[in-house]
């Protein structure tokens, strides 16, 4: 009787321990699931508030008009800004001349260049310039693409575009030149798919901008005013250099350029001036 009782007690203990183990495992799994759910929530970026979007759209409209007013773009060219809370999205106008852009023309795209809201309006064929740079440059919050004539010229003349004065310190020791032929042979020169955009982004590297042979150029920045300011002064630097091609030019040294660039972040005075000038337009 006593031995049977002991055997039963042993079985009971094993059953109890087994049941406790299952309960503990279940509790741990439940806690793990809860932690994963919380981590997933933290990975999902919060949506931009209506106030954030309204302010950002107003600045993006202003950026388009500033670029047109300063002669950086004409009927072609474009500027984008990264989404303020979701780095995998960006805002850009639909297919439209920059000086005509309004807040209603702004489209939100993901990094595959697909409209997030299903917008069916025509888009810029070269939107891949923006998406592919945003993919590899998390520091970049805004991008400008221009066809300014003197920028085009500096991409084909055989002379490097270098900083002539302190406002163009961001050019540094020179900007790389993207030659689409090296990867894609004879084309229409446009960046019309992700592969071409990726090749351009690779040429850009960590630079503040790049020239595009037979096409134009790009500038990048940490904000809209930063990329816009750089694009305006890139054009000015190119204009000055074109006037003295073939002559001896005393460019900024790399160290002078670095020190000058440190004092020209975001171009705040220019931005306020340019914005006031253009936003009086209808």
At which residue positions do the language-model features occur?
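N-terminal secretory signal peptides
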Residues: 1-11, 36
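N-terminal export leaders
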Residues: 11-17
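Glycine-rich flexible loops
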Residues: 18-26, 38-282
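Boundary at the C-terminal end of the N-terminal hydrophobic targeting segment
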Residues: 30-31, 37
């Amino acid at each position: 009787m006593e031995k049977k009782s002991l055997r039963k007690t042993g079985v009971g203990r094993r059953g109890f321990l087994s049941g406790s183990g299952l309960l503990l495992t279940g509790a741990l799994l439940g806690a793990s699931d809860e932690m994963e759910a919380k981590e997933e929530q933290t990975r999902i970026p919060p949506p931009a508030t209506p106030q954030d979007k309204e302010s950002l759209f107003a600045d993006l409209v202003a950026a388009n008009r500033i670029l047109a007013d300063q002669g950086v773009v004409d009927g072609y060219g474009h500027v984008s800004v990264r989404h303020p809370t979701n780095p995998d999205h960006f805002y850009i106008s639909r297919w439209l001349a920059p000086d005509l852009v309004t807040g209603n023309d702004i489209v939100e795209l993901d990094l595959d260049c697909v409209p997030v809201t299903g917008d069916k309006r025509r888009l810029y064929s070269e939107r891949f310039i923006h998406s592919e740079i945003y993919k590899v440059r998390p520091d970049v919050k805004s991008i400008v693409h221009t066809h300014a004539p003197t920028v085009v010229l500096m991409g084909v003349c055989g002379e490097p575009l270098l900083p002539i004065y302190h406002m163009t310190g961001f050019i540094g020791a020179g900007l790389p030149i993207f030659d689409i032929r090296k990867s894609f042979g004879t084309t229409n020169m446009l960046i019309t798919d992700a592969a071409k955009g990726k090749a351009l982004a690779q040429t850009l590297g960590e630079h503040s901008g790049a020239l595009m042979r037979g096409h134009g150029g790009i500038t990048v920045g940490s904000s809209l005013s930063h990329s816009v300011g750089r694009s305006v002064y890139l054009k000015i630097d190119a204009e000055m250099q074109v006037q003295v091609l073939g002559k001896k030019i005393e460019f900024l040294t790399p160290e002078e350029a670095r020190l000058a660039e440190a004092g020209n972040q975001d171009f705040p005075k220019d931005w306020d001036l340019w914005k006031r000038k253009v936003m009086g337009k209808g």
